[in-house]
Amino acid sequence: PEDVAEYRMWSNAFRRLADPAYASVPTVGGTTLIPMAGLGERFLREGYAVPKPLIPVSGKPMAVQATADLPATARHVFVLRREMPGLDSIETVLRATSPAVQTVVLDGPTDGQARSALLGWQADPATERAAGPLTIAACDNGGLYRPESLQALLDDPDTDVIVWVARGYPNAARHPRMYGWIACAEGSDRVTGVSVKTPLGDPARDPIITGTFTFRRGTDFARAVERMIAREARINGEYYIDTCIEDALALGLNVRTFEIDSYLCWGTPNDLHTFEYWQSCFDKWPGHPYRLEEDRHVAPNMLASLRQTYQTTLPTLPELHS
């Protein structure tokens, strides 16, 4: 049953990648912040020569692909680390994607993703920080949703913070202590609590935090993180943005979930291989609507290269010995 459920999850995801209803995102202004001060060690150990943020996903650098489904904002701020492999190449590629891209380079490691994001936000001029919402996201996943659903939540003045969540992700059921979990009021999208690295109930059905958060005001993000740090709320020695949602609640902010329809993760070599396997399969299967050329995430100039990579091959028969 689990295998069938996983197949359906991927089939639905790739149907949506080819569906025009999922082909746009809301425009909200403000800032997108992508903390990516890690070193991508798992990919290095697997022999990847390209730094993790530049590893191709559908023909585009992973860090660029991760922003494709986020609300359109006036600025994209990527938070990097000085000693990360390929720093100069990463900055060059990111800045070439858009004049709205800025990079913040930290001099060394921090005590967690939340601190890295806070430092990135603080590096933005104060006048710009005050303008528009702040969306924070990871550099190694994407999410599919109907734009009107997110727009309705963004337009609701009763929404201070949005936590992007997903249900039914197979790896969450297999490795529940790798994820953040959200508790909501019964039958509501209003968040009542967060559990980081500890599942709340049924990991196969409960919502996981995807790593994307939208704050109506960037100052609320800073207040929540600073409160979390003041109470030393570390998980495994690090400060997580997931955890600061508890502080947002304590500050009286209205926190709501936005459940995306498909969660696409490329965070580990196995995650990326799995995504590429299903992309190759569905593109080849006549009975499935997905085609590479109809996927807006696929770089047009890389289409031929992807087809070559995914070309059908016949396995070599083993030698027979009498």
Placement of each model-derived feature along the sequence:
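The conserved acidic donor/metal-binding loop of glycosyltransferases
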Residues: 138-142
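A short acidic, often aromatic-flanked loop/helix-cap motif at beta-alpha or helix-coil junctions
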Residues: 4, 108-113, 169-172, 263-266
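A structural signal for short hydrophobic beta-strand segments in well-ordered beta-sheet cores
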Residues: 54, 182-184, 257
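Alpha-helical elements of Rossmann-like donor-binding domains used by nucleotide-donor carbohydrate transfer enzymes
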Residues: 118-119, 149-152, 244, 274
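Conserved alpha/beta core of the MobA/IspD/sugar-nucleotide pyrophosphorylase nucleotidyltransferase superfamily
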Residues: 2-32, 206-321
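Conserved beta-strand segments of alpha/beta enzyme cores
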Residues: 53, 100-102, 190, 254-256
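Conserved core of the sugar-phosphate nucleotidyltransferase
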Residues: 143-232, 310-311
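Conserved N-terminal catalytic core of the sugar/cofactor nucleotidyltransferase
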Residues: 2-35, 42-49, 55-56, 60-136, ...
